[in-house]
Regions:
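Post-Walker A helix-loop "phosphate-sensing" segment adjacent to the P-loop in P-loop NTPases
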Residues: 99-113, 347
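Core recognition of P-loop NTPase motor domains used across DNA-transaction enzymes
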Residues: 2-75, 87, 130, 138-141, ...
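Conserved inter-motif catalytic segment of the P-loop NTP-binding fold
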Residues: 46, 56, 64-65, 69-70, ...
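Phosphate-binding/switch region of NTP-binding enzymes
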Residues: 80-82, 86, 90-91, 119, ...
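Conserved RecA-like P-loop NTPase ATPase core
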Residues: 74, 97, 118, 177, ...
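DNA transaction DNA-binding modules
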Residues: 272-374
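Pre-Walker A (Motif I) flank of P-loop NTPase domains
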Residues: 75-79, 114
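Hydrophobic positions on the alpha1 helix immediately C-terminal to the Walker A/P-loop
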Residues: 92, 96
């Protein structure tokens, strides 16, 4: 494996600590009403008030793709990043934030550029300046913002983040460092229910806006056979999250760390990293196993060949689409269902957005090439 990380590294500009909220967001942000990643059952009137969808409805619906922030590593949703105090979490957060803001590969992983907000709630601006200038030099990037104070989850954090998203609709990643700083004071009253509730609230927000919330947290002192059992608190934190990263060292003074990764939208991984003490960045040393990739899908391959930068769009009926797909011999209704359930892969692997809607004249399919480099 090779290290694709580029070496030209600008620094970061500093944003204000707080943003004003508004009753209505008027930007092009797609909210929960039409871009909720989680399954939204259609409301039905019945005696029991349970909203359901049939398997037929499930297959006939196109759900928006879950966008990668870092391919095979980090996606939209809510993730935990957990490690012991002073293990190097904040250096990793700064490194990740910079790479996403600049769109530079993180080691061998492709990164999708976007605005980043880093809530460095255990730091001050002077410390951030020293750390970041040592890591990235003094050239600036306008896509990376910092705040050292924020409200708690129950006291208006969501309004603050909404205000930032309103001003920066291309935001892709928000880092909260640390979870404890945005929790209500609970002491020993924390429970599975309260742990699950706070992450669920954060996840609801990230799903509503299609962004990634990466929440930094600490491990507990007690060792465990399963590294994910070392997350401080109860299993409610991991149970509600979309995934988690656990950073561990054998000894605090070691330069080498293991990064265990688990998630709903990416394969489980164990990476070996080495800390460069001169530049204060984490370097990739290797992975325990190579990532398993789905084999090519002949249908998606045929669809991808239809579009090009010169002809980035196509729309028509499913029957017309079948006529364009040489070598594909299935019924039109089966074609649309296969594309419905493959919309996520079609977007993330081929850069093609797939839409399907029914009009008074029948069903219409639209294909749009949004990223020819996918």
């Amino acid at each position: 494996m090779t290290d694709n990380r580029k070496t030209t590294v600008p620094g970061a500009s500093v944003g204000a600590d707080a943003v004003q909220s508004s009753d209505k967001i008027t930007t092009n942000i797609i909210t929960n009403s039409d871009k909720q990643i989680n399954l939204q059952a259609a409301k039905k009137s019945n005696n029991f008030g349970l909203n359901t969808v049939s398997m037929t409805e499930l297959y006939d619906t196109v759900y928006p793709p879950r966008r990668p922030i870092v391919n095979d590593l980090l996606y939209s949703g809510t993730y935990l990043f957990v490690g012991a105090p002073k293990v190097g979490k904040s250096f990793f957060m700064g490194q990740l934030a910079y790479h996403v803001a600049m769109g530079l590969p993180l080691w061998e992983y492709e990164v999708h550029q976007g605005t980043v907000l880093y809530l460095a709630l255990e730091d001050d601006y002077a410390r951030l300046q020293r750390r970041l200038s040592r890591m990235f030099g003094v050239e600036e990037t306008s896509n990376l913002y910092f705040a050292t104070q924020a409200k708690s989850v129950s006291k208006g954090l969501d309004q603050q983040l909404e205000g930032f998203i309103r001003e920066h609709p291309d935001v892709r990643l928000i880092i909260i460092d640390t979870l404890q700083k945005v929790r209500e004071i609970g002491g020993d009253r924390y429970s599975y229910a309260s742990d699950y509730e706070i992450v669920t609230k954060l996840k609801t927000f990230s799903d509503r806006y299609g962004i990634c919330l990466l929440v930094v947290h600490h491990t507990r002192k007690m060792e465990a056979e399963d590294s994910f059992d070392m997350i401080s608190g109860t299993n409610g934190l991991l149970g509600a999250a979309d995934g988690a990263f656990i950073m561990q060292k054998k000894r605090r003074t070691d330069n080498t760390a293991l990064l265990d990764i688990v998630g709903r939208d990416q394969p489980d991984q164990e990476l070996t990293l080495e800390f460069d003490r001169e530049r204060c960045v984490w370097e990739f040393q290797g992975a325990e196993t190579e990532l398993w990739k789905l084999p090519p899908d002949p249908l998606l391959e045929a669809v991808a060949k239809m579009l090009s930068p010169e002809q980035p769009e196509w729309s028509g009926t499913p029957t017309e689409l079948l006529e364009r797909l040489s070598g594909v011999s299935i019924q039109a209704n089966i074609l649309t269902r296969k594309l419905n359930v493959s919309a996520d892969r079609l977007y993330n692997d081929y850069g093609i957005r797939y839409e399907s809607k029914r009009t008074h004249e029948g069903r219409v399919v639209k294909l749009t090439l949004e990223n020819s480099g996918a």
